[in-house]
C-alpha cells in the first residue's frame, strides 16, 4: 500500500494503546514521506494541517478494526481542514481500502455504521470533494478546468442570415456587356463588395484589461418569448439547508476567534454567525439585568399618582434642625429629609409627586 506521493495518516486515539498495530501501518509506508496525526489533537485544535501538501489522506480504523471511532470524531471542521491539506487531485481514503462511493447507501436506519458513513460522505462532498470513476473521494483540480466561452449575439447573426442586407446581394443579374466590354453583373458585384468593405464601421478597441459584454441584441425580448433562452433554474436559497443543518452549532473560523480574555467584535459584513451570536448574548444579559433590577425594586414603596406628599414652607423661618434645608445638599445634614431636592427659597411651597420635585 506504499505510495510515491506524500501521505497523511489520521489515527483515532484508541490506536495509541496498541503500538503494534500503529507500527505495522507505518511500516507499510515510506517513513520520510508519511506524516501521522491523532484525530483528537485535531479536534481540540492542538495541531493544524499544512495547506496543499498531501497526495493521500488515509483515515485509519480504530482498535476494533472499524471506522466507528473515526466517524464519531471527524466533524465538518476537521473535514474542511483535511480537504485544505490535500493537493489538487489528492484523495481521501480509508484503511480498509474500500471506496466510499462503493459502500452501502445508508438507507437502513437500524445500522448506525451506515448512517455514520452516509453523514461522513455528505460532509466530504459539502467540503468540496467529488467521486472519481472508481468511487474514491477526490479533490478536483480547479486550475485544470477549461473555461467555456460565452457565445453572445446569436440572435443578431441569425437575423442577418435570414434577412441579409441590401449591400450583400445584387438587385438583379444583367448579362449584357457594358460599354467597356465588362459584364454588368460582374461590375455590379464588384461595386457591391467594394461598398460593403468601405462602409464597415470601425470599432474602438476595448481598454487593456477591461472586458465588455454586448447585451444589445437581448433588449426587448421577454424571457417567455425567447425560443433559445437560458435553461438556468432559479434556486430558492432557503431550500439548500435542512432542519439538521440549521440546528448544527456555528463553527467559528480561526481568524474570528477572540484572544484569551478578550471579546472579538463581529465584522461589518459578518457571515459566520458571530454577529447574531453576540446580539443574542447581549439580549440575554439585558434581560437578566432587568429581571434582577425588578427583584431589587420590588420591596421599595412606590407612590401612586393620587398620593401626594406636600411640604409647606409658607411660614417664614420654618427650617430644619440644621437651618440649612433650603440651601441645597451641600449644606444639609445627613438625616435631612430634603436630601436630593434642589435649593429653594424659605417660604416657597415644595411638592413631591411620584418622586419628582415640583417647585
From Swiss-Prot:
Assign the protein's first listed, main location to one coarse class. Answer: cytoplasm
Entry comment, domain topic: The C-terminal domain binds 2 Fe-S clusters but is otherwise mostly in an intrinsically disordered conformation. The N-terminal domain has structural similarity with S-adenosyl-L-methionine-dependent methyltransferases, but does not bind S-adenosyl-L-methionine. It is required for correct assembly of the 2 Fe-S clusters.
Q: Where is this region: N-terminal SAM-like domain?
A: 1-148
- Quote the biased-composition stretches of kind Low complexity, using this chain's numbering: 184-200
Q: Which GO biological process annotations does it have? A: iron-sulfur cluster assembly
- Positions with biased composition (Basic residues): 152-164
Gene name of this polypeptide: DRE2
Q: Where is the segment annotated Disordered?
A: 97-116, 149-210
Any single GO molecular-function term of the entry would be:
2 iron, 2 sulfur cluster binding
This chain's protein is named Fe-S cluster assembly protein DRE2
Origin organism is Blastomyces gilchristii (strain SLH14081)
Extent of motif Cx2C motif 1: 322-325
Described purpose of this protein according to its UniProt entry? Component of the cytosolic iron-sulfur (Fe-S) protein assembly (CIA) machinery required for the maturation of extramitochondrial Fe-S proteins. Part of an electron transfer chain functioning in an early step of cytosolic Fe-S biogenesis, facilitating the de novo assembly of a [4Fe-4S] cluster on the scaffold complex CFD1-NBP35. Electrons are transferred to DRE2 from NADPH via the FAD- and FMN-containing protein TAH18.
Q: What residues form the membrane-spanning segments?
A: none
Ranges for region Linker: 149-246
The coenzyme or cofactor needed here is: [2Fe-2S] cluster; [4Fe-4S] cluster
The domain of life is Eukaryota
Amino acid at each position: 500500500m506504499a505510495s510515491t506521493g506524500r501521505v497523511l495518516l489520521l489515527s483515532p486515539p484508541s490506536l495509541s494503546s496498541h503500538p503494534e498495530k500503529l507500527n505495522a501501518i507505518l511500516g507499510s509506508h515510506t517513513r520520510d514521506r508519511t506524516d501521522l496525526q491523532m484525530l483528537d489533537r485535531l479536534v481540540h485544535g492542538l495541531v493544524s494541517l499544512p495547506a496543499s501538501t498531501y497526495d493521500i489522506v488515509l483515515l485509519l480504523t480504530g482498535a476494533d478494526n472499524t471506522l466507528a471511532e473515526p466517524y464519531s470524531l471527524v466533524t465538518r471542521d476537521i473535514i474542511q481542514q483535511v480537504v485544505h491539506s490535500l493537493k489538487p487531485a489528492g484523495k481521501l481514503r480509508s484503511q480498509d481500502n474500500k471506496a466510499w462511493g462503493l459502500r452501502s447507501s445508508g438507507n437502513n436506519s437500524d445500522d448506525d455504521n451506515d448512517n455514520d458513513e452516509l453523514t461522513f460522505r455528505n460532509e466530504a462532498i459539502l467540503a468540496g470533494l467529488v467521486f472519481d470513476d472508481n468511487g474514491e473521494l477526490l479533490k478536483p483540480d480547479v486550475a485544470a478546468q477549461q473555461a467555456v466561452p460565452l457565445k453572445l449575439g446569436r440572435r443578431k447573426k441569425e437575423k442577418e442570415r435570414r434577412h441579409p442586407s441590401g449591400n450583400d446581394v445584387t438587385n438583379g443579374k444583367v448579362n449584357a456587356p457594358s460599354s467597356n466590354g465588362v459584364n454588368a453583373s460582374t461590375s455590379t458585384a464588384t461595386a457591391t463588395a467594394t461598398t460593403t468593405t468601405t462602409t464597415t464601421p470601425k470599432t474602438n478597441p476595448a481598454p487593456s484589461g477591461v472586458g465588455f459584454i454586448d447585451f444589445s441584441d437581448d433588449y426587448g425580448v421577454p424571457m417567455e418569448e425567447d425560443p433559445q433562452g437560458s435553461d438556468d433554474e432559479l434556486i430558492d436559497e432557503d431550500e439548500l439547508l435542512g432542519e439538521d443543518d440549521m440546528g448544527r452549532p456555528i463553527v467559528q473560523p480561526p481568524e474570528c476567534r477572540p484572544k484569551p480574555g478578550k471579546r472579538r467584535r463581529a465584522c461589518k459584513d459578518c457571515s459566520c454567525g458571530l454577529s447574531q451570536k453576540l446580539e443574542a448574548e447581549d439580549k440575554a444579559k439585558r434581560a437578566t439585568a432587568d429581571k434582577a433590577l425588578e427583584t431589587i425594586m420590588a420591596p421599595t414603596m412606590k407612590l401612586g399618582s393620587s398620593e401626594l406628599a406636600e411640604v409647606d414652607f409658607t411660614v417664614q423661618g420654618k427650617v430644619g434642625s440644621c437651618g440649612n434645608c433650603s440651601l441645597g445638599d451641600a449644606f444639609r445634614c445627613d438625616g435631612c429629609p430634603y436630601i436630593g431636592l434642589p435649593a429653594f427659597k424659605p417660604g416657597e411651597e415644595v411638592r413631591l409627586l411620584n418622586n419628582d420635585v415640583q417647585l
